[in-house]
């Protein structure tokens, strides 16, 4: 169960093994928490996560399998980073890029924590993500409303980019990921 939860939290497709003739796809974490003792995933999915675990060793700045799936995976995903409590980033929390630059501060990934990863559907834009995480936040989102100084990472399946939420737009941050 612990392994299934770890992989589910990282974004893996997990199936419950029950008395039914075919496995049941897991759509919520609590299904694993209260579900049967047996789980399965496709061989391709298992191999994908084994490769991500191996790739993580090359990048010590990647803190979790969930983050590795976002930054190194080949699926279309997006992630939201918010400033960690008690980090130097608190000095520029909720401040715009102009303020940060004029005060000689630098945006550093180590000041942030990954608070959400989701599927990047169709032609979803940064503005769409901003609207969703301010008006109709997903139930499993545990951060504050998407705000100035947050970072949105987009993985289109081929390229990964980081974007600073500024006062009225988004600014691409090539230095944030440093992969």
Model-found features: residue ranges?
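A generic structural signal for short, non-catalytic loop/turn and secondary-structure boundary residues
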Residues: 71-74, 107, 147, 158
């Amino acid at each position: 169960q612990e392994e299934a939860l770890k992989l589910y939290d990282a974004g893996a497709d997990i199936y419950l093994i029950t008395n039914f003739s075919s496995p049941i796809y897991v759509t919520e974490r609590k299904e694993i928490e209260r579900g049967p003792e047996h789980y399965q995933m496709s061989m391709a999915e298992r191999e994908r996560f084994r490769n991500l675990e191996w790739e993580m060793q090359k990048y010590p700045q990647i803190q979790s399998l969930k983050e590795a799936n976002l930054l190194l995976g080949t699926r279309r995903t997006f992630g939201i980073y918010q400033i960690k409590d008690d980090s130097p980033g608190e000095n520029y929390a909720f401040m715009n890029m102009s303020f940060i630059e004029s005060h000689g501060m630098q945006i550093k990934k180590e000041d942030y924590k990954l608070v959400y990863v989701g599927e990047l559907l169709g032609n979803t834009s940064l503005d769409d993500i901003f609207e969703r995480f301010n008006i109709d936040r997903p139930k499993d989102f545990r951060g504050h409303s998407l705000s100035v100084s947050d970072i949105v990472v987009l993985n289109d399946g081929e390229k990964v980019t980081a974007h600073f939420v500024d006062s009225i737009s988004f600014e691409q941050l090539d230095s944030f990921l440093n992969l």
